[in-house]
Amino acid sequence: MTQPLLNRTTIARFVDAFCALPAERDALLAVAPHVGHFIDKRGTPVNFDAERILGSQHLDALYVAGKMTLLRVDHARERANLLGTSPALFPLDELEAMDIDTQVDFEMAQYFYNRRHAGLI
């Protein structure tokens, strides 16, 4: 996990939310919601109608998974699927969802980490 701004309170709330899941949910995924006009690698719209483009504030969010995952034990033993078959979503705020994949990501995370620990955010 490379989310350096994820705090222990959020992790505790995540575990509590998992423990409170209804029986029909087999996983809890911490996700990063993103709203915008998304296209696939061919340029095909994913979440909007290209003939009638709405403002992004009218679009449903899409979610990036892989931030944190908890699975029911029986599911984890039976499958190698880290998303579950009927997951519930646990949205993270933008700072806590920040992932480090590049040098720029690292520098941005370092900037916000320092600001948070200085009490500025």
Task: Briefly describe each language-model feature range.
Residues 78, 91, 96-121:
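Hydrophobic helical membrane-anchoring modules
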